Amino acid sequence: MPSHCSSLLCARFRLSSLAVIVALAASGVRAEGAGSSPSAAEIDWRPRSELPPEVAGRLPVFCEGGYLPGTVGGDGAVVPGEGIEGSMPLEASALNARYELDSELYLQGDVRLRQGPFQATGAEARYNQQSGELQLQGPLVSRGEGFLLTGQDANYSTQSGQLDINTATFLLHESELRGEASSLSRVSESQVVISDGMITTCGPGQNDWSIVASDIELDQAEGFGTARHVRLEVLDAPVFYWPYITFPIDDRRKTGFLYPQFGSSSAGSGAYLALPYYLNLAPHYDATLTPQYIHGRGLFTEVEGRYLSQYGESVLQLGYIDNDSAFRDENPGENGERWALDFTTRAAFGGGWSGYGDYSVISDEDYLSDLNRSLEIDQATHLQRRGGVRYYGANQYFETYLNGYQTIPDRIADVDKPYAQLPEVIYGGSLEAGWLEASLESQYTWFYRDNENLTGLDKANGQRLRAIPELALPMRALWGFSRPSVSLDYTRYELDDYTLGDAGFDRTVPVFEWDNGLYFDRRSSLFDVPYNQTLEPRLYYAWADAESDQNYIPDFDTGIRSFRFDQLFRRDRFTGGDRVGDANQLTVALTSRFNDLLTGAERARVSVGQVRYFEDREVDLFGEGASDRSRSPLAGELVLNPIDNLELRSSLLWDHETRKTEEGRSQLIFHSEDYRYLATLGHTYSRPDELEQTDIGTVFPVTDQVSAIGRWVWDSELDRTVGTLAGLEYNNCCWSFQVVHQNYLTDDEELDTRLLFRIELKGLGGSGGASDNIADAIYGYDERERRRFGNPRR
């Protein structure tokens, strides 16, 4: 028998496959849909001024507003998504209702439906109890966990949870992806199928860019979308067409084309266009194939493969061009085939054990400057190949590795090429015995180089064993420390092709060191900020009785350390193991720190020190490294952090004999709290190397949306610019654009140029390579990029 309710009371129903329960309750909720219907995005969009302060504070300044998801439950609480929708009862309410037993329920006026995490509102609804199908007339609004849908009418299955909407709009809150469609099917909680649809991450009414397609499927569970017959539109004008694409809607990986990369470089003879294709082969390995056309050179391909295991990650990168026409023209006799390979691996085995490997090889010395765009190979004269394992424990460490090089420029003489270590084994350990501390540092190396065309010491290869046992008496207190120690620096050689005597010989150097420091502090204040000021004097004495003439020993891996403040507390002025410096010297140094007692931050540190030599240093490395000075240059360091966003670092070597600065390095770094403003000012000076350069870099917002980017490097000795970078960046809340012009110095001391672009569509990634070059040039830019886009959340 039909039943109906026509008063202003609300009929509220709880429906299941077994029974229908009807209850009456008062309703004070306004019906949706009067007048023109807002889209899903318009419903949840809030201007910046209407957002909660904590949400607005997370928005970038170039965003005018953001989305605030509404509540799912009618009582203001989000309905938990427990269970399968079809197994949960349907709750319904309306201003009027007519019910036919075991047949149909008709609802009219402010209809509200809820089944588990699914909720919808509309003007009218018909529910067929036999089939479980529900027809809803709009304007309707459907809300669930992380999404909002609107439309003119819909069909909903209470058994499967599928919702089909005509003339629909939608919003995915997590990715801020919105759109519209002639029809939309919510197949499941996480899957949406769209016909004749449009999607974008721009705000409501702002279709700066959009993807328009005949069919679009969004899978939130998998994190990607697929589309057919796709147009990329900019300001409603089509600019690109794909018959089929897949695209990410979150940070997860998905096989498909990435966005094109393009730019211009005089090194590449003009413009280039790249179309990367990403292969998500398995959860633990993937690959990226990047074919690219370079004007003047031809088709060039780069491939990157990544493999992730329970122990670590391995990356293989390849570059190949079959026929580089520009290279062939510049190098008669070459066929134009060029290639490069770079492999890196890192592994952690547990228990303190780890492994690593690096291998790089290129076809010719100009490859890196002409072609390299993505391989992680630095421009260098020698490419290192190294692989080994290491162990770090509480009181000991061990490492063994193989190490070799590819010398890139053919013009480098054989005598200047580095030796390979095949292998090198390092062991060190320490133990405490009462007041004493015993330690050992040891190293075994087999050195090899192709010396067939060399003579004398340069022709030698062979083995070297070095061991330094030490016995120390460390004494520590809150007010200071003292550490006297004695050690023996022992080296044994077994050489091949050695012509100056017995090929097996050793060297023993007795060493005494005594390091002492005191600590004083006092409380003070500056501008009503309490500080703790320290005064830390330090005395370090070193004595090493090394034989003065060690030039009968080949130079396998030895160099002379650059003298800086930290060198004040090293007894040996040589790196490597083929020379042990003689020493009889005393270092006097003083450090003072200013620590903010409110935050614990070190606001200032100043250090100064000098070495007093009691004897001439006679050990040299084939004419370099010996000296008869009685005092070293005065070495100083200054670090200032007056505020969290400003830092000044400066180091200085001043020669009291010549009263001139030997070396100086200074860098001033500033960034605003949100990293929108970046500024660096650097100066480097070296009198021995005849080097003086000034470096200025900045990212400066011209408006909330437009920023200027620049860097300039000037060499005073060459009296010329040696590097520039200038560009503009535009940001709004749905896309950004960068254009950068860069000059850089090549090996032949000529300025090369390149023009780089980058376009990023929020939520879909970017194309172009400008950002990487800016990050390499300007300190803090990586952090700025990380913060550039923000999503409001409650």
UniProtKB/Swiss-Prot annotation:
The record's InterPro entries line, in alphabetical order, gives: LipoPS_assembly_LptD, LptD, LptD_2, LptD_C
Q: What is its main location?
A: membrane
Q: In terms of domain of life, where is this protein from?
A: Bacteria
Please give a single GO biological process term from the UniProt record. Gram-negative-bacterium-type cell outer membrane assembly
- Any keyword Oxidoreductase? no
Signal sequence span per UniProt? 1-31
**Pfam families with a match to the protein in the record:** LptD (PF04453), LptD_2 (PF19838)
Task: Indicate where this protein resides in the cell.
Answer: Cell outer membrane
Which terms in the GO cellular component ontology are assigned? Answer: cell outer membrane; transporter complex
Per UniProt, the keywords (alphabetical) are: Cell outer membrane, Membrane, Signal
Summarizing the function annotation, the protein's role is: Together with LptE, is involved in the assembly of lipopolysaccharide (LPS) at the surface of the outer membrane.
HAMAP family xref list: LPS_assembly_LptD
Question: How does the record describe its quaternary structure?
Answer: Component of the lipopolysaccharide transport and assembly complex. Interacts with LptE and LptA.
Looking up PANTHER family in the UniProt record yields: LPS-ASSEMBLY PROTEIN (PTHR30189), LPS-ASSEMBLY PROTEIN LPTD (PTHR30189:SF1)
Report the sequence similarity comment from the record.
Answer: Belongs to the LptD family.
What is the protein name stated in its UniProt record? LPS-assembly protein LptD
| Species assigned in the record | Marinobacter nauticus (strain ATCC 700491 / DSM 11845 / VT8) (Marinobacter aquaeolei)
- Gene responsible for this protein: lptD
